[in-house]
Amino acid sequence: MEIVYKPLDIRNEEQFASIKKLIDADLSEPYSIYVYRYFLNQWPELTYIAVDNKSGTPNIPIGCIVCKMDPHRNVRLRGYIGMLAVESTYRGHGIAKKLVEIAIDKMQREHCDEIMLETEVENSAALNLYEGMGFIRMKRMFRYYLNEGDAFKLILPLTEKSCTRSTFLMHGRLAT
């Protein structure tokens, strides 16, 4: 196994089809083609793949992370991890963690104040991964998923702005 991490080439339809297949097989939510295009067309620099150069198909992703970033309430820049998937035969080798680290690093360089995501309450592997990387449970969202499963919203604070209520930031109450 020789894992290489790189940005997704959005012009490569084979890579796109592979990450769609990987995510569709791995996540509980079905995503339409429009959701993928929304992320990939607006934030192509925030999608990374992992490939195994020693496999018979070295250009086919065995892991991926799909992210975006937006202003949040016009007071902070929020990164968002929308999708993270690793092929089941490659789990347990730190691939998901490395993909998250790459995404966090990129969002920090883009001056995000925080990074947010949701994950299923029952997904202990994901919760252990994210909380081990510093993400904090912010709230439980009941019946969040189509399967009526609950989700936790997790946030990784990156700057002081992330630790200050938006109301105070909007009204200029943050001491600088």
From Swiss-Prot:
<dbReference type="InterPro" id="IPR044542">
    <property type="entry name" value="NAA30-like"/>
</dbReference>
<dbReference type="GO" id="GO:0005634">
    <property type="term" value="C:nucleus"/>
</dbReference>
<protein>
    <recommendedName>
        <fullName>N-alpha-acetyltransferase 30</fullName>
        <ecNumber>2.3.1.256</ecNumber>
    </recommendedName>
</protein>
<dbReference type="InterPro" id="IPR016181">
    <property type="entry name" value="Acyl_CoA_acyltransferase"/>
</dbReference>
<feature type="domain" description="N-acetyltransferase">
    <location>
        <begin position="3"/>
        <end position="159"/>
    </location>
</feature>
<dbReference type="Pfam" id="PF00583">
    <property type="entry name" value="Acetyltransf_1"/>
</dbReference>
<dbReference type="GO" id="GO:0120518">
    <property type="term" value="F:protein N-terminal-methionine acetyltransferase activity"/>
</dbReference>
<dbReference type="GO" id="GO:0004596">
    <property type="term" value="F:protein-N-terminal amino-acid acetyltransferase activity"/>
</dbReference>
<keyword id="KW-0808">Transferase</keyword>
<comment type="function">
    <text>Catalytic component of the NatC N-terminal acetyltransferase, which catalyzes acetylation of the N-terminus Met of L-A virus GAG protein and possibly GRH1.</text>
</comment>
<comment type="similarity">
    <text>Belongs to the acetyltransferase family. MAK3 subfamily.</text>
</comment>
<keyword id="KW-0963">Cytoplasm</keyword>
<dbReference type="GO" id="GO:0031417">
    <property type="term" value="C:NatC complex"/>
</dbReference>
<dbReference type="GO" id="GO:0032880">
    <property type="term" value="P:regulation of protein localization"/>
</dbReference>
<comment type="subunit">
    <text>Component of the N-terminal acetyltransferase C (NatC) complex, which is composed of MAK3, MAK10 and MAK31.</text>
</comment>
<dbReference type="GO" id="GO:0005829">
    <property type="term" value="C:cytosol"/>
</dbReference>
<dbReference type="InterPro" id="IPR000182">
    <property type="entry name" value="GNAT_dom"/>
</dbReference>
<keyword id="KW-0539">Nucleus</keyword>
<keyword id="KW-0012">Acyltransferase</keyword>
